[in-house]
Amino acid sequence: MSVISMKQLLEAGVHFGHQTRRWNPKMAPYIFTERNGIYIIDLQKTVRKAEEAYNFIKEVSTEGKDILFVGTKKQAQDAIKDEAIRSSMHFVNNRWLGGMLTNFSTIKKRIRRLSEIETMQEDGTFEVLPKKEVIKLKGELEKLEKNLGGIKNLDCDNIGAMFVVDPRKEKNAISEAKILGIPVVAIVDTNCDPEEVDYVIPGNDDAIRAVKLITAKMADAIMEGRQGEELAE
């Protein structure tokens, strides 16, 4: 039995691609037909490719490696955060800061600063500081938490794969992953270049339900890999 069914994919609208004028010809093998000026993705291929991606992610997870979830577009933010947290993984869902992986030592300093302010908030330091100072620190904390909260405990050397929603939008993240030799699994819509990705899951990257469905399956793969047992449907 496949990890994801045609019925689930259809119900979530995974088959809807972009308008025909906004396409990447390299996605032609994954396109089933064109309807009302929109490309329809071949879901049989999505089923097969999702299975390949699932097995790869499961294998990476079994080896004790981490998966970094990346999706900063509005439609992906919640699913990326929720599913990364559910599978005890790391995520970037607000903004990809340049050098997040390739210059991790600098990013680490910002993470340390985030922990510092969190400690101040927890140990009562905020209560003895001037109000103006506290407002400033809270603003800094909010910004740091937004950008770095999902990678607070990331060990850059232990990333086994990156899962991405929309490779076009996340091209900077993908190019850093490539530099470090980190394989990329991604939901790839009809306007993207599949050659940028190691494990292509052809599908709609603009519908919240479609993104949630596939992202949740990748989280399931991680959990199955860690537990070494099939997760009940």
Swiss-Prot record:
Source taxon at top rank: Bacteria
Key words of the record: Ribonucleoprotein, Ribosomal protein
A Pfam family: Ribosomal_S2
Ribonucleoprotein among keywords: yes
Residues passing through the membrane, by range: none
Record-linked SUPFAM superfamilies: Ribosomal protein S2
GO-annotated molecular function: structural constituent of ribosome
Keyword match Ribonucleoprotein: yes
GO cellular component: cytosolic small ribosomal subunit
GO biological process, one term: translation
PANTHER family per record: 30S RIBOSOMAL PROTEIN S2 PROKARYOTIC AND ORGANELLAR (PTHR12534), SMALL RIBOSOMAL SUBUNIT PROTEIN US2M (PTHR12534:SF0)
NCBIfam families in the cross-refs: rpsB_bact (TIGR01011)
Family named by the database record: Belongs to the universal ribosomal protein uS2 family.
Name of the protein this chain belongs to: Small ribosomal subunit protein uS2
Upper lineage: Bacteria, Bacillati, Bacillota, Clostridia, Eubacteriales
